[in-house]
Amino acid sequence: MKLSEELIYRGFKAETTIENPEDLDNRQSKKFYWGADPSADSLTIGNLAAIMMCACFVRHGYEPYLLVGGATGQIGDPKENGERDLKSLEEVEHNKKCIREQVETVIRNAVSRLAPSRPSLRGSGAHSAPVVADGLETAYSNHSLTMVDNLEWFSKINYLSFLREIGKNFSMTQLLDRQFVQNRIGEGGSGISYAEFSYTLIQGYDFLHLYREYGVDLQLCGADQYGNCTSGIHMIKRLENADADVWSTPLVIDPVTGRKFGKSEGNAIWLAASDNGSGNYTSVYDFYQFWMNQPDAAVENLLKIYTLLGKEEIEEILKKHAEHPELRLAQKALARGVTAVVHGAGSAETVENLSETLFSKETDFSEFTEDELTEFAAYLPVIAKGTLLVDALVNTGLAESKKKAREFIAQGAISINGTKVQEDLAVNQTAIIKKGKNKFAIVK
């Protein structure tokens, strides 16, 4: 399958300046960049869709550049309904490091089609990158990921020089016509700061700089960034008399809530698997379960976007799934595939086995050994023996508050080693606490 065919098949096409997608197959220059602002110390599955698109380009011989916005991250991408909180310089620096690790790991895993399965993986979080495949395909080894930070050049730019070269050649009319600007400055809007208003100029200059320094003439982005990205095209045309392009991918919409997958929407699924103090993480187990719980109506598109499975493989999985939907074969393939790309093939295999064990009707929770519970503890929240059940539920995240914890207990939604409990008590033995159908914690 050619690049143009794969992009369309997987749904990686929204607005673009490229009239004929087939032009990507024989493009003379094969360098692109994708940017991420360090507004958090972890990316989300919303970002992951764009990264998977980038990996698709790399598999077809394109050279990738990752721009981590140390400069733009200090301002914040303008929102539709209000100004973002400014991050401290220390936060921005920390977030840049974490994002770099995540993007490189995902692209390398996605390009290499993953290494053979490994027994398990511990501590894959914001600082410790997930398993990276041993044997990288030629596409990646020939074009390793080049990481750049726009703070490197913006820290050296004179403000007046920037206004003379860029500000003088940029139309305010284009900015004022942007929908987010209209929403912010219109009646009932929150207004917009000069810093936010300048964001699109800064992002456009990034494209110009990468064109001048590296010959990058293609930018990839999410559909919500398309307007900002075209600013760079205008600058390159005006100042270098050269052509450049933007290719965007649609935002992925949660089929249950109707909202986009992303950290601004309050339903974020993070790529980091352990907390680094910010709370921006999703455990490998919860990450796997998120994909397992996707509805049948959404799973085909998600398999195309988020896994490395080919067209024939996806069609075969969907055929078998239609024959026996109760087995949830499509959801299992989705959960296994995405978890492997983000957290490594070993983690995907381990958490899949863990899930099957926890959900099996034949499992006797009281018979787990200390070693088995230690293995589970790498993927499930852990609480010390002797903790009161109400406190255990709150401290492991199974309940939002003590009031909620008591309600769950009274409703019979809590069990210890498979036995329902209806009163608060100290959990003194090694055990597995279960809430509802799919939430677990370890007591040890």
What are the language-model segments listed below?
Residues 1-33:
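Positively charged, low-complexity intrinsically disordered leader regions
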Residues 10, 88-89, 95, 108-111, ...:
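Divalent-metal (Mg2+/Mn2+/Ca2+)-assisted nucleotide/phosphate chemistry catalytic cores
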Residues 21-78, 219-223:
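N-terminal catalytic cores of NTP/NDP-binding nucleotidyl/phosphoryl-transfer enzymes
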Residues 73-95, 102:
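Active-site-proximal loop->helix
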Residues 76-80, 157-163, 257-265:
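Short acidic, glycine/serine/threonine-rich loops at helix termini
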Residues 112-142:
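Intrinsic disorder/low-complexity segments
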Residues 235-444:
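Conserved nucleotide- and phosphate/pyrophosphate-binding catalytic cores
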